[in-house]
Amino acid sequence: MDNNMEIDAARSPEPHHLSPTTDPGSIPTLDGWIESLMTCKQLAEEDVRRLCDRAREVLQEESNVQPVKCPVTVCGDIHGQFHDLMELFRIGGPNPDTNYLFMGDYVDRGYYSVETVTLLVCLKIRYPQRITILRGNHESRQITQVYGFYDECLRKYGNANVWKYFTDLFDYLPLTALIENQIFCLHGGLSPSIDTLDNIRSLDRIQEVPHEGPMCDLLWSDPDDRCGWGISPRGAGYTFGQDISEAFNHNNGLTLVARAHQLVMEGYNWSQDRNVVTIFSAPNYCYRCGNQAAIMEIDEHLKYTFLQFDPCPRAGEPMVSRRTPDYFL
């Protein structure tokens, strides 16, 4: 984000704080935290530490290919756009009434990465069977030091402790999810090192995102119009063609790969003869791209519906008319 886009509206109110003896796993504590976070108030540093400790216990029990049941609503990138996350919940339904699967990239670029990721982690602990949060390529120590989350933590807390608590927690996020053994969900895309879901299950995910290899590819790769594997212009992961996604889906008994990671102007985009769908849930990305956002509702019969939404106008934040972006951010 450009420095000159930092505005008074992004500065945080006093953090919500509960007593040091409060159990971070208790329902009253979590409900208090969630209530505060829903008004875009950050938690106190010590509460974030205890929250992340509790979340690690929950996440380390989950699989690299986390099973998810229908009905569920699948969401793409959020990127710290907290008020647009509130709009997403308004459109899709509140927790725990709606089951949610988020496919990563909660932080960086938007004004409110701290509040966004804290709320999603709180909801995960409070309703562990109702919400699934996967790892994106921005849930990384290196990436967050460049694209905003690190600097936001310094600005809002005066030190890097909260950044460290969350980036340590990111190592425990599941890499992928599998809806009813049919719809495969992940942040980025496929890997030449991975032929089967069992290949993914055997990975050691508790680490910083590597610069190369299968774990990197799952978070960084993109579908492409060209067949086969290609070198990614991102500098990490690969591009993969329709032949690759068709073979992967066929070999693993899948009907669809759902992924995020790329800005699409209508919020969702089918590709590769409907073997792959891209979902992007940050409207007017970076407060200037003019795109719609979307979420994918999947009912108990595995029928899906896309709900598109625009950003909420907010005082103090720049607005743009919709336009085609000059490049993918």
Swiss-Prot record:
Residues 1-25 are annotated as: Disordered. Its cofactor is Mn(2+). Its EC number is 3.1.3.16. Mn(2+) 2 binds at D105, N137, H187, H261. The keyword Metal-binding applies. Mn(2+) 1 binds at D77, H79, D105. Gene3D superfamilies: 3.60.21.10. One of its GO terms (biological process) is mitotic cell cycle. Pfam families: Metallophos. The modification Leucine methyl ester is found at L329. Keywords: Hydrolase, Manganese, Metal-binding, Methylation, Protein phosphatase. GO terms for molecular function: metal ion binding; protein serine/threonine phosphatase activity. GO terms for cellular component: cytosol. Residues 8-17 have a biased composition (Basic and acidic residues). PROSITE patterns: SER_THR_PHOSPHATASE. It catalyses: O-phospho-L-seryl-[protein] + H2O = L-seryl-[protein] + phosphate; O-phospho-L-threonyl-[protein] + H2O = L-threonyl-[protein] + phosphate. Binds 2 manganese ions per subunit. The active site is at H138. Belongs to the PPP phosphatase family. PP-2A subfamily. Involved in hyphal morphogenesis. This is Serine/threonine-protein phosphatase PP2A catalytic subunit. It comes from Emericella nidulans (strain FGSC A4 / ATCC 38163 / CBS 112.46 / NRRL 194 / M139). The lineage of its organism: Eukaryota, Fungi, Dikarya, Ascomycota, Pezizomycotina. The gene is pphA.
